[in-house]
Amino acid sequence: MNTNLKNLTTMLVALVMLTGAGAAAQDAAEIMEQSHLAYYYAADDGVAEVTMTITDKRGKERTKEFVMLRMDESDGGPQKYYTYFRKPSDISRLTFMVHKIPDGNDMRWIYIPSVDLVKPIAADDKNSSFVGSHFSYEDVSGRHWSEDTHELVGDSTIGESPVWVIKSVPKEKYKGFATKLSYVDKDSYLPLLESYYDKKDKLVRVFRAEQIEVIDDIVTMTVRSMENVKKGGKTTIEFSDISYDTGLDESIFTERYLRNPPRKYIK
């Protein structure tokens, strides 16, 4: 093979390898986008009763009950969440609201009825515990897929479900994790398992989809859990009485309704 032909062959091989790597990265990002939409953007809005069971490292359990309302402006775009706590008595009537802004800092507020106070939650508090659970505030309302780089690292199965295995790394400094492995169902695009690692590559937390049902023709995760491997303990969240496309009024997601919950949905 002459030198010119050899050089051309080398260039073509390199181009194919680069193109393949770019396509794989693009595919991984697309998978994570679809997963985010399937998990956090089902229908245009949603209402559900929620039971949260918090188990500490000694096995002691606490249960909290609340109602969650969600409204989307567009798929992958701004969202609004409203959460009203029923039980236990020490947090009864506490409300929590999020205005998610994909390209900016989310806005979060909490209403504390015991002191009649609406308190903004700082953007850097998004990784703190959501009402004492093993889920963070951001776990509840979602971390946007565009904030991380994604790599398709393989295929596997969870139970009988074939999944993609995606490695995600934050684009900017982030307290939540250094690396995350997501096991995304190839049929529903829901994340069936997520493993969170710190900067020393130590496993810190594990998220699991415990139960999935079809509700109003939408594949829905009705039971999910988060285990803190590093510190111990686990929180399980169960959704019931789920309704989609209810026609929620946008005015619900304002400070007025933090103090005065919408009785149509909070009975």
Residue locations for each model-derived region?
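Sec/Tat signal peptide C-region and signal peptidase I cleavage site
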Residues: 21-25
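Hydrophobic alpha-helical targeting segments used for export or membrane insertion
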Residues: 13-18
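Short, low-complexity, Pro/Ser/Thr/Gly-rich segments in the mature regions of secreted, periplasmic
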Residues: 254-267
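Bacterial N-terminal signal peptides that target proteins for export
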Residues: 1-12
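Gly/Pro-enriched, hydrophobic low-complexity segments
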Residues: 33, 86, 97-99, 107-111, ...
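N-terminal mature ectodomain segment of secretory-pathway/periplasmic proteins
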Residues: 28-114
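Ribonuclease/tRNase effector modules and their secretory precursors
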Residues: 26-27, 51-53, 62-68, 75-77, ...
